[in-house]
Amino acid sequence: MAVLEILTAPDPRLRVQSKQVTDVASVQTLIDDLLDTLYATDNGIGLAAPQVGREEAIVVIDLSDNRDQPLVLINPKVVSGSNKEMGQEGCLSVPDYYADVERYTSVVVEALDREGKPLRIETSDFLAIVMQHEIDHLSGNLFIDYLSPLKQQMAMKKVKKHVKNRAR
C-alpha cells in the first residue's frame, strides 16, 4: 500500500478516458493505494484512478467523519439523474479552488463493488454529487470544465500558484 502523487490540472493524464476493469482481483492493490492516498489528504472525500495517473475505471469515496467507511466503485456509470441544482465543488486535482457546478441531486449509479459484485446505488444526498464528480474523472472531465472560460482561467491561476508554493 502506498500514498500516490495526486496529479494537478492541466496534467494531460487527467484527460485520459478510463478503461473498464475486467479483472477485479488485479486492481486490489490500486484500490488500497487510492484509499491510502485519499486518507493522506486533509480534506479529500473522493478520488478517481486518473487523478493518480492510472487508467482503470475506479473511484473511491468516503464521506464518513472518521474516514472509515470507504465506498469503492469499479466501472461506475450514472444510469439516471433528476433535479439539477447548483452546488459548490472542489477537487484534489484543482487545489485551492471552489466553484458552483450544476449537478443532479438524485442519481442512480451502477458499478461493481470491491469483490466484483454488481451494485446499484440510488441516492438523493451529497453522495449523489460526489459520485457524479468522481465518475466525471473517468471520462477525463474536471469540474472546472462546467465553468465559463474566465472562471477556468481563474482556477488555473490558483492551481499554478498552489503548485509553485508547494515546490518551495
Curated annotation (Swiss-Prot):
UniProt keyword Hydrolase, yes or no: yes
The protein's required cofactor(s) are namely: Fe(2+)
Entry annotated with the keyword Repeat: no
Q: Which reaction does it catalyse?
A: N-terminal N-formyl-L-methionyl-[peptide] + H2O = N-terminal L-methionyl-[peptide] + formate
One GO process term, biological-process aspect: co-translational protein modification
In this protein, the active site sits at E134
Cofactor note text: Binds 1 Fe(2+) ion.
Q: Entry's InterPro entries? A: Peptide_deformylase (IPR023635), Peptide_deformylase_sf (IPR036821)
Q: Which domain of life is it from?
A: Bacteria
Q: Which UniProt keywords apply?
A: Hydrolase, Iron, Metal-binding, Protein biosynthesis
Q: GO molecular function, one example?
A: metal ion binding
Residues that, per the record, bind Fe cation: C91, H133, H137
Entry EC no(s) = 3.5.1.88
The UniProt entry's sequence similarity note says: Belongs to the polypeptide deformylase family.
- Protein role: Removes the formyl group from the N-terminal Met of newly synthesized proteins. Requires at least a dipeptide for an efficient rate of reaction. N-terminal L-methionine is a prerequisite for activity but the enzyme has broad specificity at other positions.
NCBIfam families the UniProt entry points to: pept_deformyl (TIGR00079), PRK00150.1-3 (NF001159)
Q: Which PANTHER family match?
A: PEPTIDE DEFORMYLASE
What is this protein identified as? Answer: Peptide deformylase 2
